[in-house]
Amino acid sequence: MAGLTLFVGRLPPSARSEQLEELFSQVGPVKQCFVVTEKGSKACRGFGYVTFSMLEDVQRALKEITTFEGCKINVTVAKKKLRNKTKEKGKNENSECPKKEPKAKKAKVADKKARLIIRNLSFKCSEDDLKTVFAQFGAVLEVNIPRKPDGKMRGFGFVQFKNLLEAGKALKGMNMKEIKGRTVAVDWAVAKDKYKDTQSVSAIGEEKSHESKHQESVKKKGREEEDMEEEENDDDDDDDDEEDGVFDDEDEEEENIESKVTKPVQIQKRAVKRPAPAKSSDHSEEDSDLEESDSIDDGEELAQSDTSTEEQEDKAVQVSNKKKRKLPSDVNEGKTVFIRNLSFDSEEEELGELLQQFGELKYVRIVLHPDTEHSKGCAFAQFMTQEAAQKCLLAASPENEAGGLKLDGRQLKVDLAVTRDEAAKLQTTKVKKPTGTRNLYLAREGLIRAGTKAAEGVSAADMAKRERFELLKHQKLKDQNIFVSRTRLCLHNLPKAVDDKQLRKLLLSATSGEKGVRIKECRVMRDLKGVHGNMKGQSLGYAFAEFQEHEHALKALRLINNNPEIFGPLKRPIVEFSLEDRRKLKMKELRIQRSLQKMRSKPATGEPQKGQPEPAKDQQQKAAQHHTEEQSKVPPEQKRKAGSTSWTGFQTKAEVEQVELPDGKKRRKVLALPSHRGPKIRLRDKGKVKPVHPKKPKPQINQWKQEKQQLSSEQVSRKKAKGNKTETRFNQLVEQYKQKLLGPSKGAPLAKRSKWFDS
């Protein structure tokens, strides 16, 4: 605050805070401005203070502002006034000692956040042993084992971690575990006075607690007396401060009450008492109750303390009135927002930096738990204007295109702060959650209408294409199963020469400013009819691209769509979010699951399951073997008659033409693409199947083999004919009927007449 605060000296007695603020607001936004006045009157004492929000405005004000209503004024950077509680001992003490005290206090407050207490500690355990045990959970900043005046250990210790996450892991991992042969109890460390308050609940310790409260009240009262004496002495010191330009926080607070300017301390207290909407009302009620209980306890302590003089009683009453005074509520102004789902490690400075993009902030306050002093995961923030608060609410809504506000990897939930009565009503009413999952708001993304500014310079052919695509989109979206994808883009009007690599490069360049851009799919659609070998088909002029994140897809769409600099002004890309069919996506998931099951079953069994299609090569080999076996089994007479018969066509087995889906519906069976090249070898008709790998044998050897096979087959057939004459007779009759009905084939050789010696 001191670096942003200016000390303004040599002001006339008629100077007012409003006039001073009007003068300095010409340089930049003024956060705070007041003129120090005489007690009991509005006359200016000749100096004042101005606080800016930005350091640049402070530098400008030092250079530009030199006069006030025609009078020359002194403008310097205000110095922080450091008070020493023992002023009576000497005002000439070195100022370095009091500077160290507030820093030490701040460090203690920060340390409490990630600090653990280890009870029931063994006397054999040293600080180094304790550090080595807890170092496995994270960075240990400090280890402390308190000792008695005689040097013996007290049986407990403290471990300070770097952040809350590591401390939480250590608490879960080491609670009720043994260290040096002794089971320890690990818990969050709290302030000593709060621990004593919790321990003084029993009836036995009530008297002791009253005595301690009495002592604390006497101490507080003594501090208040010193503060009141210091305030009285401030009148003498302010003249020196005017020359030195010293800035005092306490003077500022007292004088702000008189000048009706909001104090920073009041703002922070007001943040704690802020009631929250439905889900956040519990936090706000607890905080407000704590504030009220604190003020009541202070009043009781002042009432119990025995005052020696009437002046001390008057001062105590004044202090209690100040504490009990209700602060004005700023909920109805619509400038305060309540933030939920905060990370426990998030700080007020980080949250303030995130919210400053929407407008100037009055305060940011993270709600702390009263016992542990850890963050509750929620906060309050008040903007200077109502418009800034509305901008913040719009940016944080989940329906926003940017995806809402994120801090430390968590999605922030922002709502307007409401009164306690409204919060109670919101708890009873159930909020209807949006059920739309079709993302129809993205259907208009990339739309360019004729006659608009975006349509200037677009060729008539491109506009006709856009109108046609828009009409098709409207027709498809009438089906409830069609939805708009959030990550998949459809790109039309692409040149024929653009391939997958060029398109991927274009999309990555469009999202070059983003971090972690990943394209899952990028495919230019091509005509595959009449294409063989490694030849690529001609591009169809459109493509699909799928991103990992919605924000990246949205940025690529807005940069590439209708951009004349990519492919020229006459051929501008038409980019829109792709339409998806839920039914087809379900079918795709089922196919993937089946393939995964097949892959898992193969290494387990080593053989394909029943009903699974075999590879094409195995099918061909098995078919050839089966064919040769059948030929060897057929008797020679049937072979001769079969040779004379004509081709009877394919003899196929009845196959299922429809496939039943899991939802009960049926669809036509889709045959898979062939896994081999060349002419189709059909397994349904065995009439003209060639051997798999035919070899050209020598003619003499081939004839000798044929004769040998005929002799062997005749011998086998004679043996079988004796055993089963009825079957051979039936086959002969069938062959005779075939010859009569179909006639002998042209290419078939004439049947040999039986010789006289065969009978």
Swiss-Prot record:
InterPro entries: Nucleotide-bd_a/b_plait_sf (IPR012677), RBD_domain_sf (IPR035979), RRM_dom (IPR000504), RRM_MRD1_RNA_proc_ribogen (IPR051945)
Tissue: Ubiquitously expressed.
RRM domain: residues covered: 4-80, 114-191, 335-419, 487-597
Comp. bias intervals (Basic residues): 689-698
Disordered: annotated segments: 84-105, 201-330, 594-759
Comp. bias intervals (Polar residues): 700-715
Any one of the GO CC terms: spliceosomal complex
Cross-link Glycyl lysine isopeptide (Lys-Gly) (interchain with G-Cter in SUMO2), sequence positions: K653
Subcellular location: Nucleus, Nucleolus
Primary location group: nucleus
Composition bias, Acidic residues: 225-256, 284-313
Residues carrying N-acetylalanine: A2
GO molecular function list: RNA binding
Keywords on record: Acetylation, Disease variant, Hypotrichosis, Intellectual disability, Isopeptide bond, mRNA processing, mRNA splicing, Nucleus, Phosphoprotein, Repeat, RNA-binding, Spliceosome, Ubl conjugation
Pfam families for this protein: RRM_1 (PF00076)
Residues with Phosphoserine modification: S122, S397
BP GO annotations: mRNA processing; RNA splicing
Any coiled-coil regions, as ranges: none
Family annotation (SUPFAM superfamilies): RNA-binding domain, RBD (SSF54928)
UniProt subunit comment: Interacts with U1, U2, U4, U5, and U6 spliceosomal small nuclear RNAs (snRNAs).
PANTHER family cross-referenced by the UniProt entry: RNA-BINDING MOTIF PROTEIN 14B (PTHR48039), RNA-BINDING PROTEIN 28 (PTHR48039:SF5)
Biological role stated in the UniProt entry: Nucleolar component of the spliceosomal ribonucleoprotein complexes.
Disease link: Alopecia, neurologic defects, and endocrinopathy syndrome: Affected individuals have hair loss of variable severity, ranging from complete alopecia to near-normal scalp hair with absence of body hair. All have moderate to severe intellectual disability, progressive motor deterioration and central hypogonadotropic hypogonadism with delayed or absent puberty and central adrenal insufficiency. Additional features included short stature, microcephaly, gynecomastia, pigmentary anomalies, hypodontia, kyphoscoliosis, ulnar deviation of the hands, and loss of subcutaneous fat.
Protein name in UniProt: RNA-binding protein 28
Species name: Homo sapiens
